[in-house]
């Protein structure tokens, strides 16, 4: 059962200084005046009286913890990325944050983005109408976190820093605390943990560890803590789905790494990366092609970015077997590989063991900062540009793409629209919607050409190079035989049709 408890001001339907209660089949909401809640714990109410009594005995979030959650207000002037010399209208938006050790406030980078004279940030404590000026001390868009400083003894009086916990197990009950856009009331929403996985941080297009929770959340909750027991397990930063029922949380390992990096370095980048792309090696045919023994585990390198510390050391089609002596699983469990790398720091050296043409090699490689291929420009900073002869030259940034609604022009490509499950394609199920660029090293012109290349294969292995440098290898004769069986299984008359 989900519930949402809001504390801090009297409902507009209540004329007396009394709690007002709204109950529906799924959600129970309590709105209490601040005077009634100070020094008390938050309770929720259900139609079921027994359930209500049970909840009263074990309230979700202590009032002292709520005292440490603040509302964040940002006023900014945004620059146009298409015409970068122009400013757009002034914008005001907000979110949530909470106190951490060292008299600092932790929030999302997108809540206070920008570190220039055109950004003004203020914070307000729970139950207070006083806004205090805040300064962005540290910001990292790759993990969507920022640290604020407030130079006011009055603000910090009686406020305790919240403590961080560990990554929660699945189905753990959690509470989202923050200030949704619906009003100035602090709200507590109950939910459960539904997943822990590497995911996209949409604002920066980077991939780091995330926690997914089933809880109704809103934009103003961004930057607020997600709590279990008396510990913070993460910071809410994204919402998935039209019904706003799935919240995405930055977990404590990412938060701790950011805070430690902020204390140790003046640079914003704190997460390490090999700056390369890989794929799993579950399929027996591709394992045989790259001379992997049955007991060997590893992942195949598809592409190495020129900015990578592994550039000119590792090679495309190398198989990463281990990092610092820790085996890499063929299943490409991104939490164990990507998260392991990201928890190291830029310029830190790691020992990488690879399999190259059937032989093992080890190399020391320096990590680079986590950085997407397209530069993540702070949306409210003055963009870089150069004008000559009426041409405006700008770097391609994510904010430019967002402003311009940039789209690649349509071209005729051959893509894998579906993967029909069979032993022959085991391990390739996630290659759906990828473009086929080459067949056995020959660039694909169109669908007819792809058919000719496949049916004209004379080698033992059929190799398909896909977009994003993904590779697919099939035993040609086995694949031909499996094709007939798959067609018969799905009652498909022919493997080929043309307009």
Swiss-Prot record:
* Any one GO CC term of the record: mitochondrial matrix
Instruction: Provide the top EC class.
Output: hydrolase
GO molecular function annotation: serine-type endopeptidase activity
Residues passing through the membrane, by range = none
* Transit peptide endpoints, chain numbering: 1-24
**Which stretches make up the PDZ domain?**
272-356
Which Gene Ontology BP annotations are present? proteolysis
Question: Which key words tag this protein in UniProt?
Answer: Hydrolase, Mitochondrion, Protease, Serine protease, Transit peptide
Q: Where does this one sit in the cell?
A: Mitochondrion matrix
Active-site residue list: 110, 144, 222
InterPro entries of this UniProt entry?
A: DEGP_PDZ (IPR041517), DEGP_PDZ_sf (IPR046449), PDZ (IPR001478), PDZ_sf (IPR036034), Peptidase_S1_PA (IPR009003), Peptidase_S1_PA_chymotrypsin (IPR043504), Peptidase_S1C (IPR001940)
Q: What is its EC number?
A: 3.4.21.-
One Pfam family, please name it.
PDZ_2
Using the UniProt annotation, give all residue ranges assigned to the region (Serine protease): 94-259
- Superkingdom field: Eukaryota
Q: What does this protein do?
A: Putative serine protease.
UniProt family annotation:
Belongs to the peptidase S1C family.
Which PANTHER family does UniProt cross-reference here?
Answer: PROTEASE DO-LIKE 11, MITOCHONDRIAL-RELATED (PTHR45980:SF7), PTHR45980
The protein in question is named: Putative protease Do-like 12, mitochondrial
């Amino acid at each position: 059962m989900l519930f949402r408890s809001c504390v801090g001001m009297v409902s507009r339907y209540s004329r007396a200084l009394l709690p007002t209660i709204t109950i529906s089949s799924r959600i129970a909401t309590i709105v209490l005046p601040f005077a009634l809640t100070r020094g008390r714990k938050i309770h929720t109410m259900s139609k079921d009286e027994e359930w209500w009594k049970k909840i009263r005995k074990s309230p979700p979030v202590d009032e002292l913890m709520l005292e440490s959650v603040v509302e964040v207000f940002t006023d900014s002037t945004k620059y146009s990325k298409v015409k970068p010399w122009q400013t757009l209208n002034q914008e005001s938006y907000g979110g949530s944050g909470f106190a951490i050790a060292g008299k600092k406030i932790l929030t999302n980078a997108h809540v206070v983005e920008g570190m220039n004279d055109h950004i003004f940030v203020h914070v307000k404590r729970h139950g207070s109408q006083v806004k205090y000026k805040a300064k962005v001390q540290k910001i990292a868009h790759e993990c969507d976190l920022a640290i604020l400083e407030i130079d006011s003894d009055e603000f910090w009086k009686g406020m305790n820093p919240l403590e961080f916990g560990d990554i929660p197990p699945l189905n753990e009950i959690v509470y989202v605390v923050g200030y949704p856009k619906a009003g100035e009331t602090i709200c507590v929403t109950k939910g459960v943990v539904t997943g822990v996985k590497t995911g996209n941080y949409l604002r920066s297009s980077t991939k780091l560890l995330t926690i997914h929770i089933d809880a109704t959340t809103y934009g103003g909750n961004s930057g607020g803590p997600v709590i279990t027991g008396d510990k913070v397990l993460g910071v809410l930063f994204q919402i998935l789905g039209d019904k706003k029922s799935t919240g995405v949380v930055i977990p404590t390992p990412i938060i701790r790494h950011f805070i430690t990096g902020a204390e140790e370095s003046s640079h914003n980048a704190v997460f390490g990366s090999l700056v390369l792309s890989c794929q799993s090696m579950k399929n027996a045919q591709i394992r045989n092609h790259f001379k992997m023994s049955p007991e060997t585990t590893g992942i195949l390198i598809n592409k190495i970015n020129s900015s990578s510390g592994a550039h000119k050391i590792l090679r495309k089609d190398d198989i990463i077997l281990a990092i610092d002596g820790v085996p890499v699983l063929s299943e490409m469990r991104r939490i164990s590989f990507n998260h392991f790398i990201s928890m190291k720091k830029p310029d830190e050296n790691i020992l990488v063991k690879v399999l190259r043409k059937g032989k093992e090699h080890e190399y020391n490689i320096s990590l680079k900062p986590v950085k997407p291929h397209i530069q993540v420009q702070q949306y409210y900073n003055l963009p870089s540009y150069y004008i000559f002869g009426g041409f405006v030259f700008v770097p391609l940034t994510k904010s430019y793409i967002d402003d311009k609604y940039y789209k690649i022009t349509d071209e005729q490509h051959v893509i894998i629209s579906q993967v029909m499950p069979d032993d022959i394609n085991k391990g390739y199920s996630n290659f759906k919607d990828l473009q086929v660029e080459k067949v056995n090293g020959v660039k694909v012109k169109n669908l007819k050409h792809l058919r000719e290349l496949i049916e004209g294969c004379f080698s033992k292995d059929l190799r398909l190079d896909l977009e994003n440098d993904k590779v697919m290898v099939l035993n040609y004769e086995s694949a031909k035989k499996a094709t007939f069986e798959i067609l018969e299984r799905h009652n498909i008359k022919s493997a080929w049709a043309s307009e």
